Structure formats: structure tokens, C-alpha cells
Amino acid sequence: MSVWAIGDLQGCYDITQRLLEKINFDPAQDTLWFCGDLVNRGGQSLETLRLVHSLRAHSVVVLGNHDLSLLAIGARSEEEQRKVNPDLLRIVLAKDRDALLDWLRMQKLAHVDRALGWMMIHAGLAPKWTTQMAEKHAREVEQQLQGGGYRKLLRNMYGDQPGWSPGLIGYDRSRAIINLFTRMRYCTPRGRIATDDKGTPGTQAQGLYPWFEVPGRVERDLKIVCGHWSALGLTITQGVHAIDTGAVWGGKLTALQLDTDELRVVQVPGREVTGPAPVARAPRRPRERLGRQRSRGNRGNAGNTAVPAKPPVDTPQD
């Protein structure tokens, strides 16, 4: 039996199939861990979602920002749904859409296997979160997402603010937790996410750190595997194994074997693309950037009273 973690698929069905063939995946005895962002941008999102759904008895999935965006689209009116890009439109118009979206909504924000010694998330963790705290906060949002009020959560999850604080309540709290698990790249030592910085370490504004290198962060008792940050490439440091290697942008799709002491990585070439991947923005002056974030954050700590950002039609917050 082998346990494999796989990076962001993003609707790259053919590439996913090639990777499964290369690792000799046997559903009778192997298990797959998918790091989120199953859909969007790759052109084969419906096929990819159906594939992972068909493997549900032999796999674990954590939700990424693109997956949550798809769920939000699925909860909107038919008129709004028809405005999305063709890749996602095929899902919301599919005959099996309800089965696919209902299953997707039941997936986790964090998966932990203490016997194996691993935690899987999509993006990142707050600097002061232990793995136990992360599990607890993930379960909070999962219960909302899996409950009868999930549509209201999906309408209120958009927005960069507030930053995480243990005292947050209502949808402000849920939004902050979702942003950490699904959008995190850089943050301040206090854990405030910098959503505009998406490039490789060294390009970020002063005072920001990769979430896994923040000074004063807690030591964690599990190894962590994650995706989301394709600009990093394959990165293994500080007990974190980042395996989104940009398959949808012409990079590679990566699998990491988790049930072995040896580092075993298997990759296949990603999608052929005609245009460049998104270019990281030049860093702005830290005083301006962090000052604006603090002022916005101070307005957002009032539980359900904060006005959520208007959700985009089909583009998830990155």
C-alpha cells in the first residue's frame, strides 16, 4: 500500500491520468491525497472532478480556493451561473452536477493522519496555530459548509478582511479561517495575510515572510503537505512540503509519497500553454501596504456586521 499526495490539478484531466499511471496507482491498495484546487483553468474540470469523485473511496481531498469558488457558483441563480468561464460552466450544466457539488461540499479544509505523521492543507496556517488548533478551526468551517446554511457561508466568504484573531465571530471568523487555509502565501509575524504578494521568496514587500518561515511561529508535530503556491515550485523546508508545481501553467504535476522515510517525488509534464504564467507584482513599500491592511482590518472585527466583498463571477480569490 502506498499513500501519495498530489498537487493542484486545476482541471488538467489528461495530465492527472498520466501521473496516476506513472505512480502505478492501484485503487485496491493505494490512497491518494489531493491538495485542493481540483478545478478551473485547465479546460477539463468536469472530467477531473468526475475522476476524483470516482476515486472517493480511495482518496482524501482538501478544498482549495478554486473549489470553494465553484461551490459558490453552484449556489447562485441560473442566470449568474451562465456568466462563468466555459470550463466551470460545463460543471454547473452537467447532469451529475448535484452529485459532484454535494460531494465536493463535504470535503475538508485540513486532513490529519497522526499515525502517518502528516497534515494536508491547501495553502497555509496561521503562525501560532498548532496542528491541533488548525484541525479545530477547520472543523468549524467544515460544519458550516456541510450544514443547511452553507449558501449563506458561500455568499459571505469573499474578502481579504479581517485578519485572523481568536476573538472573531460569525462570518468574519469563517472568512479569516478560509483565507488562511486556502489563500495564504506571505504574512506578517502577527499572521496578517498579504494577498497581493504571490511571487517567489525575495519578491515580497519588507516585513512579510512565507507562512512557513515566519519568526515566532509554533513548532508543529506533523509534517505538512500543501499546494496553492505554484511560483514556489517543489519546496521542502521547515517540515513543509509544497507540491503545486504549476501543471496548469506549463510546469509539472507532482506526486509525493507519504508512507516512506525516503523522499520519493514523481512528476509528469504539465499542460502546454501559449501564454505566460501570471507575473508576480513588484513589492510595494511596506509602510503603505501594512498600514492599509491594519486600517481595513480594524473595520472588520465585528462578527456578522462587516459587509462582505462582492463575489466575483467565476474568478476565485488567489
UniProtKB/Swiss-Prot annotation:
Highest taxon, organism lineage: Bacteria
Claim: Electron transport is one of the keywords in the record: no
Species of the source: Xanthomonas oryzae pv. oryzae (strain MAFF 311018)
CDD domains listed in its UniProt record: MPP_ApaH
UniProt-recorded Gene Ontology molecular function terms: bis(5'-nucleosyl)-tetraphosphatase (symmetrical) activity
Function: Hydrolyzes diadenosine 5',5'''-P1,P4-tetraphosphate to yield ADP.
Composition bias type Pro residues, residue spans: 309-318
UniProt key word Hydrolase: yes
Signal sequence interval, chain numbering: none
Organism ancestry: Bacteria, Pseudomonadati, Pseudomonadota, Gammaproteobacteria, Lysobacterales
EC number: 3.6.1.41
Entries under Pfam families matching the protein: Metallophos
Designated name of the protein: Bis(5'-nucleosyl)-tetraphosphatase, symmetrical
Basic residues: compositionally biased ranges: 282-297
Residue ranges of the region described as Disordered: 269-318
PANTHER family per UniProt: CYTOCHROME C5, PTHR40942
Catalysed reactions listed for this entry: P(1),P(4)-bis(5'-adenosyl) tetraphosphate + H2O = 2 ADP + 2 H(+)
Keywords: Hydrolase
Stored SUPFAM superfamilies: Metallo-dependent phosphatases
Family: Belongs to the Ap4A hydrolase family.
